[in-house]
Amino acid sequence: MKNLFIFLLIFNIPISLKAQKSTFVYLVRHAEKVVTDPTNKDPLLTEQGHQRALNLGEKLKKQKLSVIYCTDYQRTKLTAEPIAEKKNLIIQIYDPKNLKAFAEKILEDNKGKKVLIVGHSNTVLETIEALGGKRPITTISDNEYDYFFTVEISVAGLVNVKFGHYGDKTESSVSSYEMKVN
């Protein structure tokens, strides 16, 4: 009987670990914004930006997202709206001033799920770091809109960051093949 118990214990541990899933956090910067009025702190998207928002929806169409987060700006909301409508999700607003607390909330509320975050050039990489990942690139410039980051947090807490692109390529974007991330 003791041997049977040990046998079941040994072979059930890997099964129970496999049943638990990694958490996936997808991060993008908002799509192209109107820049004709430098005094406008909350601009809309350009036509190219609206197209990129549709491209984001296409990129994530097979993913079962549990939640979509964005900052309280028109450009982030408009970037997220097409995918939110397709997935029948209500966009949740987050405060980019406290990314550590936001990352903790994501990991606590969405363990084993898939999350989309639409942020800004000065918050996306910082959010990756707050989630425990390493920056795969040093910075996102003002004219780069096509980066798509995936942060996978395993059940054991290991963090893996990958990046690529979506939609039309931004000229100055670093190729995902030019930089490897551990």
Please provide the spans of the model-predicted regions.
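Residue-level preference for the first positions of well-ordered beta-strands
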Residues: 25, 114-118
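Long, charged/polar, surface-exposed segments that mediate recognition or autoinhibition
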Residues: 121
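Active-site-proximal alpha-helix that buttresses catalytic centers in soluble enzyme cores
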Residues: 20-110, 124-128, 134-144, 148, ...
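Short coil/turn segments at secondary-structure boundaries
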Residues: 3, 93-94, 115
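Bacterial Sec-dependent N-terminal signal peptides
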Residues: 1-22
